[in-house]
């Protein structure tokens, strides 16, 4: 693909130049080519976007629930009509295989938007009787202008996960995509406008997180920030949001999730789940089950099943339908993952497979890392303690149920967890003891629109998806009505 035209900001229903004068490049990680130069939003641009959003939000919130629902449903239809076009752009920007982006990224994002479009008419208050002459009623009102700050691994899906409940509740959103993968969020803004969303209700500000993101978190005109990213960045976003104007926050942060295989499990099923929990999207999924706990007596057989499945990984032309494994999202990220792999070797973990740059026809210029499996791992190793966010699985052995529960919970993270077992009683007994917000039994990775997702401990605050997320984009107003004559003591 030839280099795209310079990308601008999207404010008040159209493209506009950034006042900052700064730009950055977005790179195709499959081959190292520059996709586009992108303008970076500065402080004045954030001010413009907030003013625009405030204007648009008043119009949007004044519409009836059914009017808002129809507009969002129209956007869903456009997303599905342009699925392949958007998936190709997502593949170019992220490096993910087209077989993945065309069946997951836009599809699941559109599902969430459709889900919230359907929930809009259900937003309602309550009536509380006090006595014969008095009652209270409540209203759920929008927060106003909210900000979404996205991560680079699922650009358009995250933009939809954040904007769908926010818009459904009557808010306007200013969205800052990751500077690594900014392109499809701009296309989403076009689609919202085409569907009939009032100008200003969804503005997109590409830019560097340390600048544009900070301006958003500090701006007094923004009522809430929803952030997806790393723990360290999330803590800064939360601190800035609270210090500036006590903003509400939703934080979807990192994980180092345990996948526990029990001795009664079907090892073929367990190996299939472990592969998806580590190598789907080249391991760049926040919920990945990178700590795979296996009974010591089953480990040798489990390792052989993993090796057999690694042979089925197909890296190569990301637009080939047979390719199921792409490069990492950027060269700096590739180098960081390689540093973790080197650390694993240094600390004594045994490389079962991979462990280096992936080379071959058409791969040499991209940010490729071989699917890597470490075994003979221990809990104190860096690769077991820290989030790598790449195609790196760590296999750990254990002897008892109590031991594996304790070790699985021995982490600052608490995003996800899963178990593989044939014993239903054990499944529920163990899953109830795991300190994680998203849990799976005999499966991994699905996050449907109806399912609240979010973490315990350092993995986040609040939830995305599900009914409760729609409510989190509202504030409750209580109104007392007195029908008898008011009595004053004065």
Swiss-Prot record:
**EC numbers for this chain:** 1.2.1.8
The entry marks the following residues as binding K(+) 1, namely 26-27, 93, 180
Residues engaged in binding K(+) 2: 246, 457, 460
Similarity-based family: Belongs to the aldehyde dehydrogenase family.
Which NCBIfam families does the protein's record reference? BADH, PRK13252.1
| Function text | Involved in the biosynthesis of the osmoprotectant glycine betaine. Catalyzes the irreversible oxidation of betaine aldehyde to the corresponding acid.
Give the multimer and partner information. Dimer of dimers.
Protein name as annotated: Betaine aldehyde dehydrogenase
**Quick one: which gene encodes this?**
betB
């Amino acid at each position: 693909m030839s280099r795209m035209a310079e990308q601008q900001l999207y404010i008040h229903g159209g493209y506009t130049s950034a006042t900052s004068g700064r730009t950055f490049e977005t790179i195709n990680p499959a081959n190292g080519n520059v996709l586009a130069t992108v303008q970076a939003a500065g402080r004045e641009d954030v001010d413009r976007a907030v003013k625009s959003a405030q204007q648009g939000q008043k119009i949007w919130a004044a519409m009836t629930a059914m009017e808002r629902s129809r507009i969002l449903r129209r956007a869903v239809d456009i997303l599905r009509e342009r699925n392949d076009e958007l998936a190709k752009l997502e593949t170019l920007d992220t490096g993910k295989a087209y077989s993945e982006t065309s069946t997951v990224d836009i599809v699941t994002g559109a599902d969430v938007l459709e889900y919230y479009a359907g929930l809009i008419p259900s937003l309602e208050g309550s009536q509380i009787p006090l006595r014969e002459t008095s009652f209270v009623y409540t209203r759920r009102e929008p927060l106003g202008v909210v900000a979404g700050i996205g991560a680079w691994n699922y650009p358009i899906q995250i933009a939809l996960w954040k904007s769908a409940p926010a818009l459904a509740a009557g808010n306007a959103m200013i969205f800052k995509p990751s500077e690594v993968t900014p392109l499809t969020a701009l296309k989403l803004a076009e689609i919202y406008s085409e569907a009939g969303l009032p100008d200003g209700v969804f503005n997109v500000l590409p830019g560097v997180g340390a600048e544009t993101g900070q301006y958003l978190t500090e701006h007094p005109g923004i009522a809430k920030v929803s952030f997806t990213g790393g723990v360290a960045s999330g803590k800064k976003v939360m601190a800035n949001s609270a210090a500036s104007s006590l903003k509400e926050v939703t934080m979807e942060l990192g994980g180092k999730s345990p996948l526990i295989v029990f001795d009664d499990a079907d090892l073929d099923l367990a190996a299939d789940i472990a592969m998806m929990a580590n190598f789907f999207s080249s391991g760049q999924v926040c919920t990945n089950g990178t700590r795979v706990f296996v009974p010591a007596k089953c480990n040798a057989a489990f390792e052989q099943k993993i090796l057999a499945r690694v042979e089925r990984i197909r890296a190569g032309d990301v637009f080939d339908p047979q390719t199921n494994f792409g490069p990492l999202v950027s060269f700096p990220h590739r180098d960081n993952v390689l540093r973790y792999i080197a650390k694993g070797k240094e600390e004594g973990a045994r490389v079962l497979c991979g462990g280096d740059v992936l080379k071959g026809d058409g791969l040499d210029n991209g940010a490729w890392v071989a699917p890597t499996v470490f075994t003979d791992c221990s809990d104190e190793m860096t690769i077991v303690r820290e989030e790598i966010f790449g195609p790196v699985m760590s296999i750990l052995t254990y002897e008892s149920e109590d031991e594996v529960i304790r070790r699985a919970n021995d982490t600052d993270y608490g995003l996800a967890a899963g178990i593989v077992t044939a014993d239903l009683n054990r499944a529920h007994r163990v899953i109830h003891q795991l300190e994680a917000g998203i849990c799976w039994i005999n499966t991994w990775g699905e996050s449907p629109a109806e399912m609240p997702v979010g973490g315990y401990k350092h993995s986040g605050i609040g939830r995305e998806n599900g009914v409760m997320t729609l409510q989190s984009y509202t504030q409750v107003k209580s109104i007392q009505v007195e029908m008898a004559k008011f009595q004053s003591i004065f």
